[in-house]
A protein has these predicted regions:
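Multi-pass alpha-helical transmembrane bundle typical of ion/small-solute transporters
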Residues: 1-238
Length: 238
């Protein structure tokens, strides 16, 4: 079965379930990004942030998976993607923690566009890690690929929406989310084939360094934010 052909055989059903489960299993980080990005916009805009951001992410994943073999031949692509995730984590921290609810409302349209951009960017980078597994299960079937994504993405969006509500109640979850995104970014850098073939680090070392980076980025943000607040307090008000 290739291309757009399909039949409701057991083989089709098994592959379909396989793709759906792989998408769900590998999309935990993506749900966190969606939740953090949605929490950065006023509540009345959150549904559309998740719908537009998630919808664009679906289209991008389909394109990515269809050209998975080509993508994996680009040197350092996974490492660059990991680096971009640090930027995404920092941006989300700045908006979710650095802005009050009033500022979010005042900058509603700007934050809405930024949130969608961050969702799509992070999903693109994180999906670089996932496309080979999904493409392998699809065995060249576009129908299987699209069907699996259409089933898994609504669940991903729902999870992202739930995370945004939790962040409203427990702001410290933003730091947990940033730590997880940083952990994923570090792992992507060290597991890039180009870097891996030169450093030859063990899985344990990669995990330890990834955990440390997951702690360091939020810690640096907290230090930076407190320093900024101290400087603002010392500055004479006009």
């Amino acid at each position: 079965m290739t291309g757009l052909e399909f039949s409701w055989s057991w083989d089709f059903i098994v592959r379909f379930l396989s793709i759906t489960l792989i998408d769900l299993a590998l999309s935990g980080d993506n749900a966190i990004v969606i939740g953090m990005a949605a929490a950065s916009v006023p509540r009345e805009r959150r549904k559309w942030t998740i719908v537009f951001g998630g919808g664009l992410a679906i289209l991008l994943r389909i394109v990515l998976t269809s050209i998975a073999t080509l993508l994996m031949q680009i040197p350092l692509l996974s490492a660059v993607g990991g680096g971009v995730l640090f930027w995404v984590a920092w941006k989300l921290l700045r908006v979710d923690i650095g802005e009050s609810e009033e500022e979010k409302v005042a900058k509603g349209a700007q934050n809405f566009r930024q949130a969608i951009f961050l969702i799509v960017t992070a999903d693109f980078m994180m999906s670089l890690d996932n496309v080979i597994a999904v493409a392998g299960s699809a065995h060249g079937s576009i129908v299987l690929l699209i069907a699996g994504l259409l089933i898994s993405m609504p669940l991903l969006m729902t999870t992202g929406g739930a995370i945004s509500l939790l962040i409203d109640k427990f702001k410290w979850l933003v730091f947990v989310g940033a730590a997880i995104i940083s952990f994923t970014g570090t792992r992507m850098i060290f597991e890039d084939k180009f870097i891996e073939s030169r450093l030859h680090l063990s899985s344990l070392v990669i995990i330890v360094v990834s955990i440390l980076m997951g702690i360091i980025l939020p810690a640096v943000f907290i230090w930076f934010n407190r320093r900024k607040a101290r400087l603002a307090a010392k500055s004479p008000s006009l």
